[in-house]
Amino acid sequence: MITSDNVISADNQQERLVFIGWLVGFVDGEGCFSIGFVKQPDRGKRHGYSTGYQVMHRFVVTQGVKSINSVEEIKDFFGVGNVRINHRHDNHKEDLAQYSVNNERDLLETIIPFFEKYPLHTAKRYNFEQFAKCMRIISQHRHVTHEGLIQIAEIAQTMNHRKPRDELIRILRDYTPNTSNSEDIVQST
């Protein structure tokens, strides 16, 4: 019988690959990559947001609280983010366990590289790719400029299909100086 460390390592590698496959599938079904905007006209300008907006970024995986172990396994695997219980039921009958990563560095150095190496398989892959584009703009500190904010809004409006394009255009038109109509604000790339 072989009892070398190589056998143990091979078993661990196989288990890791199985877990990674499970994780990618789980995020395909239950994960979300989101970009949002928070209006902060006064406070934002004091903190370098000349646009009056803060760009919010988040990766989240949600499950019913009975499955909290799955969400905690994901947190343990990545080693970043946090797990919390969300008591908002919305369309659910139970509390929700939510794993989320909001930290820019954690997203750029852990989450994005993982899903670039192990791609998602559903339409969520497109949302991830758009999310990664936005995060790269943010990492270059271009999100604090009008041009960068507009670029992120243009990308974000193609994600998740929750906010209609017109709403994002209105937000930018109303709060971005020197623009007179939506054609001046959002241009296709």
Spans of features found by a protein language model:
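Sequence-level preference for short, compositionally simple segments enriched
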Residues: 1-189
